[in-house]
Design a protein with these regions (language model features):
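Class I SAM-dependent methyltransferase SAM-binding "motif I" and its flanking Rossmann-like core
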Residues: 94-152
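Conserved helicase motor
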Residues: 55-61, 135-138
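Generic beta-sheet signal
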Residues: 3-7, 73-81, 129, 154-158, ...
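Short active-site oxyanion
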Residues: 25-31, 103-106, 154-156
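A contiguous loop/helix-start segment that scaffolds small-molecule binding in enzyme catalytic cores
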Residues: 75-76, 155, 162-271
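Glycine-rich, flexible N-terminal cofactor/catalytic loop recognition
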Residues: 1-58
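General beta-strand structural signal in soluble alpha/beta enzymes
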Residues: 108-111, 158, 183
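A glycine-rich beta-strand to alpha-helix segment
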Residues: 72-117, 163-167
Length: 271
């Protein structure tokens, strides 16, 4: 039985390719890629002659069956995306889920990720964070996305395009988001640009920037949210100090917030 290797590719700087990645791509029997043209440029740069096939959302169902058959025939395969780590807002989630459930071997090669690079450049406390993918273009999905940001207790990472980033941030600001934001453009490339500040400041900075390339946003929890959380924590501590059992308090808060009881209990058990 063969192995499927999850292989991250550079997000901008070819020097970020590891020797292990080169060895894997040289030695597998076939490489599945999001865009064959971009994959060829990468492989040619490193002198890798392994064959390639496309794998994207449009052909996913048929390709999964092909991949399963190849693995059953003891072929080793690699999955790469256009840039960064596959499955992170890229094709491959369904494939890996099925492959694992059916007992095939999967290995993940560590490597570049714009999500992690942006987080480490944000200047925020990133001991916890949430990744929200691409900002929806409009409608109910965008409203629900904003709600996640407004309710966030930790930094949020998301993607948008250069054409939409100012419009997206303007929408968030006009609908109540009061946060510090880090905007990362062209990460690891020659013209990497980082803008930091509150949402209004960042919009002003972007208005005078030559917006091209990939955009990764890191959005801190809303300042209003932070103040409210402090007040809620204080109230919980007062109730506990006055003899309310932790389990009972966790159940009551869970009923109000829809947050699972065990998560509430974990939060208050050390108060």
């Amino acid at each position: 039985m063969g192995t499927l290797y999850i292989c991250p590719t550079p997000i901008g700087n070819l020097d970020d390719v590891s020797q292990r990645l080169i060895d894997v791509l040289n030695n597998v029997d076939l490489i599945y890629c999001e865009d064959t043209r971009r994959a060829k440029k990468l492989l040619n740069h490193f002198g890798i002659e392994t064959g390639i096939e496309s794998y994207f959302i449009g052909n996913e169902v048929n390709k999964i069956e092909d991949i399963k058959r190849h693995l059953e025939n003891n072929l080793n395969l690699a999955l790469i995306s256009d840039a960064g780590t596959p499955l992170i807002s890229d094709p491959g989630n369904k494939l890996v889920e099925i492959i694992i459930k059916e007992g095939f071997r999967v290995e993940s090669i560590p490597g570049p990720s714009s999500v992690l690079v942006a987080l480490t450049l944000s200047g925020f406390d990133i001991s916890n964070f949430q990744f929200l993918g691409f900002i929806p273009k409009s409608g109910k999905e965008k409203s629900e996305f904003l709600t996640k940001l407004l309710n966030a207790q930790m930094p949020s990472v998301c993607f948008t395009s250069p054409k939409r980033v100012i419009k997206d941030l303007d929408y968030f600001e006009k609908n109540g988001l009061n946060s510090q934001i880090t905007v990362c453009r062209e990460l690891t490339k020659k013209f990497e640009t980082i803008h930091r500040g509150d949402i209004k400041e960042v919009i002003e900075k972007l208005s005078s920037d030559n917006l091209k390339g990939e955009i990764t946003l890191v959005i801190a929890p809303s300042e209003l949210n932070t103040n409210v959380n402090f007040e809620v924590d204080s109230a919980l501590k007062i109730l506990l100090d006055n003899g309310v059992p932790k389990r009972d308090l966790a159940k009551a808060v869970s009923l109000i917030t829809d947050i699972p009881t065990n998560e509430i209990y974990d939060k208050i058990k050390d108060f």
